[in-house]
């Protein structure tokens, strides 16, 4: 397992897995190289790295980029929603954290984590109590407060 997590050997394993997948698939059907395949996936735009003009254009196009959720890392609601829409994202607090960094700043999520939970719940169309930190065994909330609300 440690070898698979090594950054230095990652490319070797990716190639071996790809070659093995081709051999397995070729047993069942013809396999051909796709000449139009682009191995580079465009990343999620990073608001804090944009100049003022680019930032203004993103906000004009998508107002969610103007709503800062994580003040420490300058992460917008738009970036979090883009992470949730990504093919690579796990819709958990840690999944979003690994993709766009809310909760990685000096407050360690003390300010933004409740907002991230709300955004995930809204995006998935589930109650706050259904949002998980990292897995099905890691709930964020356990039930309603005395007022009857589940708060994140």
Model region roles, listed by residue range:
Residues 24-63:
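Active-site-proximal substrate-binding core of FAD-dependent oxidoreductases
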Residues 66-80, 98-117:
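Local cysteine-cluster metal-coordination motifs and their immediate loop/turn environment
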Residues 86-94:
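Short, charged, surface-exposed loops that flank catalytic or proteolytic processing sites
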Residues 2-9, 13:
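Single conserved hydrophobic/aromatic residue that forms the stacking wall/gate
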Residues 30-37, 93-94, 128-131:
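Flexible, glycine/charged-enriched surface loops at secondary-structure junctions
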Residues 14-28:
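An active-site-proximal "capping" alpha-helix that borders the catalytic cofactor pocket
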Residues 125-151:
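Low-complexity, small/polar and acidic-rich linker and loop segments
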Residues 1, 48-54, 59-63, 67-74, ...:
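FAD-binding beta-loop-beta segment adjacent to the flavin cofactor pocket
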